[in-house]
Amino acid sequence: MKKRLYISIPITGMEEKSRIKAAQLQKHFEAQGYEVINPFEIGFHLEKLHDLCGHKPPTWANYMEWCVWALRSCDIIFFCVGWACSKGCTVEMEESIKFKKEIIYE
């Protein structure tokens, strides 16, 4: 059974750069045999759901709820450089510790 790996990456203020990096990391880890959870894919589905339901665009808190939910289903959390300066990544770190996830750093 493949291990699930979540990518924790700073996003706010550098969305496009982070999207590209997350996609590269996803390919890298998938080539190593991991099932990878990319937060940008979570965001894409959340945005589509809000649109289909006629809701306002998702808030930062909505994104974090979904990301934390996905993180909890993973075995390993990969923290990218800069995570400690990111509000979202620090929330993900707290959850990783709380749920005793294996943590690796870039």
Q: Where in the sequence are the language-model features?
A:
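Conserved catalytic or regulatory cores that recognize and/or transform ribose-phosphate-containing ligands
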Residues: M1-E106
